[in-house]
Structures are given as C-alpha cells and as structure tokens.
Amino acid sequence: MKTECRELFAMTVILDIEGTVCPITFVKDTLFPYFLEQLHPILSSLQFPLDKADPVANICSQFPSHVQQDETSLITYIRQLVASDTKDPVLKSLQGLVWKKGYDNGDLVAPIYDDAIALITTSSEPIYIYSSGSVAAQKLLFSHVKGNLDLTPHLAGYFDITTSGHKQDSTSYKSILHAIGNPEPATVTFYSDSPAEVRAAIEAGMKATIVVRPGNGPLTDQDRQLGTITSFP
C-alpha cells in the first residue's frame, strides 16, 4: 500500500481544496460567515443603477437584472446563493474580492493541513489546484497560510468552474488535461473529498482518490471502493 501511494505521488497532482487540503469547516464556518458579515458594509457604498467602473458594482452587475435594483434585493439574492451553496461564478468572484480584504488585514488565515503543506512544498512533480472557488480566491488562500506561509510559488496552476467547468463533469477534467499540455491521463492524479468528483476524474482517464478528513461527509461502501487516503504521505 505504501509503495502504491508513493507511485501515485510521483505523478502530476491536482488537488481539491475544501475537505482535502484544508478543513471543510474553514469554508463553512469561517469564509462563508465572513463574506456574509461584510456584505452590507461593501454593498452599502454602491450607487444604483450600478456603476461598472466600481469593481464591486462591476461584479454585481453580472447578477440577474431584477436583483440589481437596490442593496436589499442584492443582499437577499446573494444570501440565497450562499445558503444553497450554489456554484455561481459571479458569486465566487464577489467572494474572492471580499476575502482578499480579510486576508490582507489578517482577519483570515488558511489552516492548510500539515501533510498537504509538506506535499506541496516537497513534490518534484507539478501540483495544480481545482476548486469551485475562483482562481483569485484560491491564490489568496494559498498565499495566506498559517505560519505566515505562501505556498503559491510551489503550485503550477489553478482551475475553477469558470476556466474548466463544473467538478462533477468529466469534460472539465479533460479540459484541464488539455490546459496542462495533454499528458497521458493516467499519469495525473486528482484528490478530492467528493466521490462524484473522483468518479468524474476517473471517467476522464485520470487516477483519482477520495481524501477522508475530520468533518467530511460520510462515504458509502461503493464510494470507498474508489480508494481513500486520510493524509498525504
């Protein structure tokens, strides 16, 4: 088993974030609440109709027109997206902008697992990130890691639902393979806490394994047959 793990990590690696390299609670209990707390202070400065010259207004102008009438409509709509965990690219862009403020002023620090830090900083093979969060938000997270670490110099690239598609669709993984130079799919391994994402990557020809961390969702016996790890060796 250890030999098999070493062989997997001697390959190009693509990592999910939430529940894979950092606790799922960081996103649900820290990032999402912080975003919601900052909504009113940020949106209260907007002028309606929205002035696209303003970065926040420019993002909000991409939401459906019927929610752009006033601050209350915008906040209600955005809160609904967050509550339903909708993978909306416009929402992800706005979250990234808000989280940047939090990371920059020290309110937010990413609790990346120690074993994930070790993998990212010592791997001789390329490591990429694929998350539903925007590429901008991914870069913020990995550049503001506990211990005052910046892991971005060790990462080869980033992908999100805007660049590559949704994570439960096998064509998204084929798109990533094309973007990283069309390596043989079986030489690339994807790690995620989501069985559906792992299945999609396998369908695209990649190797893929489920990462089991504290707080992650339960797995069925069928899920476990896909292969699991509890940490990166």
Curated annotation (Swiss-Prot):
Q: What does this protein do?
A: Bifunctional enzyme that catalyzes the enolization of 2,3-diketo-5-methylthiopentyl-1-phosphate (DK-MTP-1-P) into the intermediate 2-hydroxy-3-keto-5-methylthiopentenyl-1-phosphate (HK-MTPenyl-1-P), which is then dephosphorylated to form the acireductone 1,2-dihydroxy-3-keto-5-methylthiopentene (DHK-MTPene).
InterPro entries for the chain: Enolase-ppase_E1, ENOPH1_eukaryotes, HAD-like_sf, HAD_sf
Q: What class of enzyme is it?
A: hydrolase
What does the record give as EC number? 3.1.3.77
Pathway it works in: Amino-acid biosynthesis; L-methionine biosynthesis via salvage pathway; L-methionine from S-methyl-5-thio-alpha-D-ribose 1-phosphate: step 3/6; Amino-acid biosynthesis; L-methionine biosynthesis via salvage pathway; L-methionine from S-methyl-5-thio-alpha-D-ribose 1-phosphate: step 4/6
Q: What is its main location?
A: cytoplasm
- Organism expressing this protein natively: Meyerozyma guilliermondii (strain ATCC 6260 / CBS 566 / DSM 6381 / JCM 1539 / NBRC 10279 / NRRL Y-324)
Give the co-factor note: Binds 1 Mg(2+) ion per subunit.
Question: Subunit structure, briefly?
Answer: Monomer.
Give cofactor(s), names only: Mg(2+)
Gene Ontology biological process terms from the UniProt entry: L-methionine salvage from methylthioadenosine
**Which molecular function terms from Gene Ontology are attached?**
acireductone synthase activity; magnesium ion binding
Protein known as: Enolase-phosphatase E1
- Which UniProt key words apply to this protein? Amino-acid biosynthesis, Cytoplasm, Hydrolase, Magnesium, Metal-binding, Methionine biosynthesis, Nucleus
Identify the GO cellular component terms for this protein: cytoplasm; nucleus
